[in-house]
Amino acid sequence: MDLLAPLAAVILTYREVDADTLGRVGEEMKKCIEILGVKRPMFVLHTCGRVEAYLYNASEEEINSVTLRYRRYAESIRVVRGVEAARHLFRVAAGLESMLIGETDILGQVEEAFDRQVKAGFTKGLLKTIVERAIRAGKRVRAETGISRGPAGLGSLSIIYVSQLLDLTKSKVAVLGAGAVGAGLAKELAERGVAKLYILNRTLEKAVEIANKLGAEARPLTREEVQKCLMECDVVFSSVHSLEYVIDRVPDGAVVKIIVDLGVPQTVAPGLPVRVVRLSDLKQLAEKYSEARKQEAARAEAIVEEELAKLPQILARRYIEEAVSHLLEKAMEVAEEEGKRAGCPTAVLAARTTVKRTLFPIIEVLKKMAEDGRLEDAVKVVEILRSQKPLLRQSEE
């Protein structure tokens, strides 16, 4: 049984379209997960460099419903399946598919999306295990190679870019957004010793939490506060996710010299009377650092392949655990029914105890089979047990 075969990934990245397009496609994906995610396990990753949807056990019709969200970019999207879909996710988490090879930001973004979608009930079952293992692979790559030495991500690159234009130690700086990218920006700017640091976020409590750690000032992310920052700050970094421009004008008398737009889609309007640095401006700098990391990338790829090779057995074990749990749950339901039918208060407890004593030895054997590498055989046994529904209700026959 190939438990990776039901996995499919629909992929659109910075290699095919620009960041602004990715942002708008990402919004379509959000609608899709709200519709399809309640039916099938699904994981959507939306960053400034990619929009990807991973589905498990989805029909062709359901996969097509996802690709329709990309219909204007039909020639650019890729649909990969099975082990290749898993390999791609592992490589993404490891930073091997990023504009800046080895960036750490992407791993934080994968974790953030994963936590959010698990809580929402969208990423579950074996797909949950696949994403967990991808995150594990990404962490192992960072721990065992030097692929992430230097800039952590595009946010770090943007700081390097700006530092070549002015002295950050003499600059007042604002960061709009306190997500994974915004928090990383704020931390690095504080470490560089900017003259004054402001952190703005829609949820003020999160901005306060980060600001307190960094000696910064927290403000709510409102139009008024953004305009105030333009009046007070030399540099403003925007890492906000918004369908509307967060900065659409620069007020008279503003002192801001540089605005960095890391938002997807773009959060800074074109044509402003100030220098605006966008993701496309960082490409050359990203290529420079990526070239320096290529030797470490080879080691990272070896780790990814090693972790990927473990995945089929891990999924088979997880499949058994889920199946046995389902089997035990159903058996307990029957036991309770039989106990209640007996009309004795202790009968329910006795019935449940009997089920446990009967099934637990079988469960232990299945676990031992899994530990001994006989996962395929264990899966077959579970399938046989699950198909014998009449055995669970002999008293009704």
From Swiss-Prot:
Record-marked site positions (Important for activity): 88
Record flagged with keyword NADP: yes
Catalytic reaction equation(s): (S)-4-amino-5-oxopentanoate + tRNA(Glu) + NADP(+) = L-glutamyl-tRNA(Glu) + NADPH + H(+)
Keyword list, A-Z: NADP, Oxidoreductase, Porphyrin biosynthesis
Binding site for NADP(+): 177-182
PROSITE patterns named among the record's database cross-references: GLUTR
TM region(s), chain numbering: none
EC code(s) of this entry: 1.2.1.70
Active site, renumbered: 48
CDD domains noted in UniProt: NAD_bind_Glutamyl_tRNA_reduct
Gene Ontology MF: a single term: glutamyl-tRNA reductase activity
Pathway: Porphyrin-containing compound metabolism; protoporphyrin-IX biosynthesis; 5-aminolevulinate from L-glutamyl-tRNA(Glu): step 1/2
One protein family per Pfam: Shikimate_DH
GO biological process, one term: protoporphyrinogen IX biosynthetic process from glutamate
Binding site for substrate: 47-50, 98, 103-105, 109
Extra information: During catalysis, the active site Cys acts as a nucleophile attacking the alpha-carbonyl group of tRNA-bound glutamate with the formation of a thioester intermediate between enzyme and glutamate, and the concomitant release of tRNA(Glu). The thioester intermediate is finally reduced by direct hydride transfer from NADPH, to form the product GSA.
Protein function: Catalyzes the NADPH-dependent reduction of glutamyl-tRNA(Glu) to glutamate 1-semialdehyde (GSA).
Family from the record: Belongs to the glutamyl-tRNA reductase family.
Domain notes: Possesses an unusual extended V-shaped dimeric structure with each monomer consisting of three distinct domains arranged along a curved 'spinal' alpha-helix. The N-terminal catalytic domain specifically recognizes the glutamate moiety of the substrate. The second domain is the NADPH-binding domain, and the third C-terminal domain is responsible for dimerization.
Complex formation: Homodimer.
Name listed for the protein in its UniProt record: Glutamyl-tRNA reductase
Gene: hemA
